[in-house]
């Protein structure tokens, strides 16, 4: 991890590589580097620990000018974040490699290569790859042949870009478990781990499939499958407004993306609602026939997407009467799973490249699930390509590492799934679907009303400026919302935060409550409100300070140690979507007060493409 850029052209490509790295900064990283085969016929590199801007300064002082090069932003997995461990890695000053992923057998390969005389200067698993490839080149002068041989010895995940001083007209790539995309130009071609890195030079992309190896030249691309057979991958044209990668009037991408939620929720609903019901064919032409067979749902996801799945469980069981299990992908893939008959496997991922979620999907195909369905924000991702059915969210590119608009659009998509399954199976109560469809049409307006509380929440954030711990509480479908609120706060403000069902207070968390631990609660006006109020009294009795986001009809008022922020009234089924907004804003303003890097919080990456 975390970002790869490569280029082969008739012009100097250093600026292209640098701009590509800047466009990948949102993914999170701790060091950066670039290697170029210069016009003087020498393979040279520049590396820096820290930001891409520091690498840019190094290149300003010692420029690299050439027509072939690779670049990388690293998120440390093996070896500390330092210049010595930064990519690209060299072998004999004639071969350079950048790598996303984890090589699981790197220790054994390292010892083997040491015995052959190779000297290691870093602590990374990547350096093993470049020396192994150099060793393979002793048997053949063809870099593509050597790469095909080398990857057979690698166990784990990798996305590789390779250049060789002896073959200065080509860029090699290999993909297994880590995404790579080729950017197709006119007399020049490019490579990246994310097409966003290349949008300044092309709008035409070719996505490598699992196991592919590619040889990229200025005027041609040749690809081989995992079996070594030549293959042609489709060229896809991508259109996205330039404003997606620009903060505009906002201080941070995260704040911009929070405020985009009414618009992207509207987009996610477009073309999917009839007059009184959800249009089932939005999931695909075979969806209705397949949904009629569904008796159970298994949801698998990671992080924020997992929280979306937890909310969906309340909807699927409470509205559609369909049993549902939700599991973290990294746990699901490593345990023995008992699959109930006619179970729909649902995976959720913003990027569609989350390593554990992809692995869980591939594992699910061997376990006898009825079919697979992806909820995803990227229509050309691996998750979408490998699933039977898909419902795309329409969040647009999400630059901030902490997910915001992707989460709310995932919730909308999952509610559409719930209503579609209930409609086909006839398990919804009479009038429920028509009511919810009408409320969904109003949802963007309700979200706008919540965003109008921005100034109020900014003032509430001041209560957290000197705090080190926070407790989030919710009941029912609001418990996963509380979990998401706690995750956002810890991600970007570095304040320790935990979430619990409010009914569990007396089973442990109450021991932590005092004047130094704020307690944040979401309180829609539903059948659990009175029980929640009792839980909050337990907090106040122990001196805890309450921040309550409560329905305007809930009858809750400010008092000593109690700060109530009135929320627009909304039907209970949609409350998890609405109540997410103030928790995102709260986390954002607390982080701003603490002076953290909101868009690129420490130690985190946007797209987790390794286990």
Curated annotation (Swiss-Prot):
Transmembrane segments: none
Cell compartments where the protein resides: Cytoplasm
Biological role: Catalyzes the first step in hexosamine metabolism, converting fructose-6P into glucosamine-6P using glutamine as a nitrogen source.
Annotated keywords: Aminotransferase, Cytoplasm, Glutamine amidotransferase, Repeat, Transferase
The species this protein was found in: Pseudomonas syringae pv. tomato (strain ATCC BAA-871 / DC3000)
Limits of the Glutamine amidotransferase type-2 domain: 2-219
GO molecular function, one term: glutamine-fructose-6-phosphate transaminase (isomerizing) activity
Gene: glmS
Pfam families membership: GATase_6, SIS
Upper taxonomic lineage: Bacteria, Pseudomonadati, Pseudomonadota, Gammaproteobacteria, Pseudomonadales
Official protein name in the record: Glutamine--fructose-6-phosphate aminotransferase [isomerizing]
Active site: 2 (nucleophile), 606 (for fru-6p isomerization activity)
Keyword tRNA-binding among record annotations: no
Catalysis: reaction(s): D-fructose 6-phosphate + L-glutamine = D-glucosamine 6-phosphate + L-glutamate
A single BP term in Gene Ontology: protein N-linked glycosylation
């Amino acid at each position: 991890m975390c970002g790869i850029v490569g280029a082969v052209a008739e012009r100097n490509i250093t600026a292209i590589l640098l701009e590509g790295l800047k466009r990948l900064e949102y993914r999170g990283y701790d060091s950066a580097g670039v290697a170029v085969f210069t016009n003087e016929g020498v393979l040279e590199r520049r590396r820096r620990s820290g930001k891409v801007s520091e690498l840019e300064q190094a290149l300003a002082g010692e420029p690299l000018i050439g027509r072939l090069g690779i670049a990388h932003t690293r998120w440390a997995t093996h070896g500390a974040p330092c210049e010595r461990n930064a990519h690209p890695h060299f072998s004999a000053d004639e071969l350079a490699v950048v790598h996303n992923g984890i090589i699981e057998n790197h220790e054994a390969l390292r010892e083997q290569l040491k015995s052959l005389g190779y000297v290691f200067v870093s602590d990374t698993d990547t350096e093993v790859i470049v020396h192994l490839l150099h060793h393979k080149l002793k048997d053949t002068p063809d870099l593509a042949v050597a790469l095909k041989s080398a990857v057979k010895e690698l166990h784990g995940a990798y996305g590789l870009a390779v250049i060789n001083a002896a073959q200065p007209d080509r860029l090699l790539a290999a993909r297994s478990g880590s995404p790579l995309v080729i950017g197709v130009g006119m007399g020049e071609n490019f490579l990246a781990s994310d097409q966003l890195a290349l949008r300044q030079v092309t709008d035409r992309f070719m996505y490598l499939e699992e196991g592919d190896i590619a040889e990229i030249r200025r005027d041609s691309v040749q690809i081989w499958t995992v079996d070594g057979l030549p293959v042609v991958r489709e060229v896809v044209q991508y259109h996205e407004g330039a404003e997606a990668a620009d903060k505009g009037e906002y201080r941070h991408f995260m704040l911009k993306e929070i405020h985009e939620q009414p618009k992207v929720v509207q987009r996610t609903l477009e073309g999917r609602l009839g007059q009184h019901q959800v249009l089932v064919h939005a999931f695909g032409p075979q969806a209705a026939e397949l949904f009629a067979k569904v008796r159970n749902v298994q949801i698998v996801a990671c992080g924020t997407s997992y929280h979306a799945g937890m909310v969906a469980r309340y909807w699927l069981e409470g509205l559609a009467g369909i049993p549902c299990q939700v599991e973290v992908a990294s746990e699901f893939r490593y345990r023995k799973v008992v699959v109930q008959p006619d179970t729909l496997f649902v995976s959720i991922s913003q990027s569609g490249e989350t390593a554990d979620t992809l692995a869980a999907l591939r594992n699910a195909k061997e376990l006898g699930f009825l079919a697979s369905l992806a909820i995803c924000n990227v229509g050309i991702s691996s998750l979408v390509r490998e699933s039977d059915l898909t419902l795309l969210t329409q969040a647009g590119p999400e630059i901030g590492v902490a997910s915001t608009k992707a989460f709310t659009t995932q919730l909308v998509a999952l509610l559409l799934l719930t209503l579609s399954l209930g409609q086909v199976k006839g398990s919804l109560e009479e009038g429920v679907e028509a009511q919810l469809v009408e409320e969904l049409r109003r949802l963007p307006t309700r979200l706008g009303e919540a965003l109008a509380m921005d100034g109020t929440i900014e003032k509430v954030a001041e209560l957290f400026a000197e705090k080190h711990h926070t407790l989030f509480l919710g009941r029912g479908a609001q418990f996963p919302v509380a979990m998401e609120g706690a995750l956002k706060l810890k991600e970007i403000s570095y304040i320790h935060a935990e979430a619990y069902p409010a009914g569990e207070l007396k089973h442990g968390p109450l021991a932590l409550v005092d004047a130094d631990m704020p307690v944040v609660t979401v309180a829609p006006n539903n059948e659990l409100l009175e029980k929640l109020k009792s839980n909050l009294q337990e907090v106040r009795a122990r001196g805890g300070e309450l921040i309550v986001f409560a329905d305007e009809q809930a009858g809750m008022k400010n008092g000593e140690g109690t700060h109530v922020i009135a929320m627009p009234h909304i039907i209970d089924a949609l409350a998890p979507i609405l109540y997410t907004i103030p928790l995102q804003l709260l986390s954002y303003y607390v982080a701003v007060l603490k002076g953290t890097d909101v868009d690129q919080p420490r130690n985190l990456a946007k797209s987790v493409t390794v286990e």
